[in-house]
Curated annotation (Swiss-Prot):
InterPro entries in the record: DjlA_DnaK_co-chaperone, DnaJ_domain, J_dom_sf
Organism: Arabidopsis thaliana
PANTHER family: CO-CHAPERONE PROTEIN DJLA
A GO BP annotation: response to light stimulus
Functional note: Plays a continuous role in plant development probably in the structural organization of compartments.
Transmembrane segments: none
Localisation per UniProt entry: Plastid, Chloroplast
Family label: Belongs to the DnaJ family. C/III subfamily.
Higher taxonomy: Eukaryota, Viridiplantae, Streptophyta, Embryophyta, Tracheophyta
Presence of the UniProt keyword Plastid in the record: yes
Source organism superkingdom: Eukaryota
Protein name, as recorded: Chaperone protein dnaJ 8, chloroplastic
Domain J span(s) in chain numbering: 55-127
Transit peptide: 1-46
Keyword Disulfide bond: no
Amino acid sequence: MTIALTIGGNGFSGLPGSSFSSSSSSFRLKNSRRKNTKMLNRSKVVCSSSSSVMDPYKTLKIRPDSSEYEVKKAFRQLAKKYHPDVCRGSNCGVQFQTINEAYDIVLKQIKNQMEGTEEFEPFDVYDEGLNGMNDPDCDTWEEWMGWEGAGTRDYSSHVNPYA
């Protein structure tokens, strides 16, 4: 995606007071006059943004059918090589940013594919393993909690050697 925008001056909206809109925003340029002068203040703003990741798989040096683990491994290797704190070349910051963008794009694609293939089973309360005293297999509950007297009022099986 490439976005370029020029405001004011002799650029895109050369006339003061003119208005235009871009794909995501609209702008209005107004006249600005100084006191006691007839000069117009004009300003020129140029913005440019481009995603330099043409093929994120090629950037990360992976196959399109790579797993999430392989993507993360490739990203870590390239990040170690091109991180601005490690790499002393003149273009390392740009390369590192490109690698980050490619990594984000590929991970989003993998996550979207995973969301489409997940199947959800309805939650069944009665399929839980331990339902306490309401468990149809109450022997397990008694065996597990019986030493504390759960479900019984007879504590004679407890022997206190200090009493």
